């Protein structure tokens, strides 16, 4: 089992967002958390990604107890998240956003050619067509969603969390 969340409780004042939630995930599994608005789905995902702290409960990754203080802690354990609200640098290119913090360099400089090639290969492998040279703020929201997904895939995450993955997509983009 790569992920185990035991008895997770999260409250906001008198509002209970999560009440003793248990989640188990094995390698290769896909898990969907379904519920009404306000049911606590995003809260449990944010807890796993280190954006929120549970009031009580335990999280285990590959059998090891974890305490995530921030997304960097979560990412270090192989957890990536495609957020409902994009976390992109609008003035940068698609490629720069995808490889940010893990970019290939030529000496101390950004190796633009290698990074573009890597993004093209990643895009082709996952059939998520993007223009690596496009400026993010000029891209439609459906394309920005693809950039978010490719950015997470580039990090080689073992666990990928999607929060409302199709919320901003057109029906055609969802089918793609």
Task: Specify the residue positions occupied by each region the protein language model found.
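Glycine-rich phosphate-binding loops of nucleotide-dependent enzymes
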Residues: 1-176
């Amino acid at each position: 089992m790569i992920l185990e969340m035991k008895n997770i409780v999260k409250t906001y004042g008198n509002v209970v967002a999560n009440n003793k939630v248990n989640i188990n995930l094995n390698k290769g599994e896909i898990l969907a958390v379904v519920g009404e608005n306000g049911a606590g789905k995003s809260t449990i995902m944010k807890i796993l990604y280190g954006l929120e702290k549970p009031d009580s409960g335990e999280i285990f990754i590959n059998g090891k107890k974890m305490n995530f203080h921030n997304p960097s802690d979560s990412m270090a354990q192989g957890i990536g998240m495609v957020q409902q609200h994009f976390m992109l640098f609008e003035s940068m290119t698609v490629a720069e956003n995808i490889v940010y913090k893990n970019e290939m360099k030529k000496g101390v400089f950004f190796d633009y050619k290698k990074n573009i090639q890597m993004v093209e290969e990643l895009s082709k492998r996952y059939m998520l067509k993007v223009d690596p040279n496009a400026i993010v703020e000029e891209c439609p929201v459906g394309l920005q969603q693809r950039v978010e997904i490719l950015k997470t895939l580039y990090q080689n995450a073992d666990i990928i969390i999607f929060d409302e993955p199709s919320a901003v997509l057109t029906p055609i983009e969802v089918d793609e």
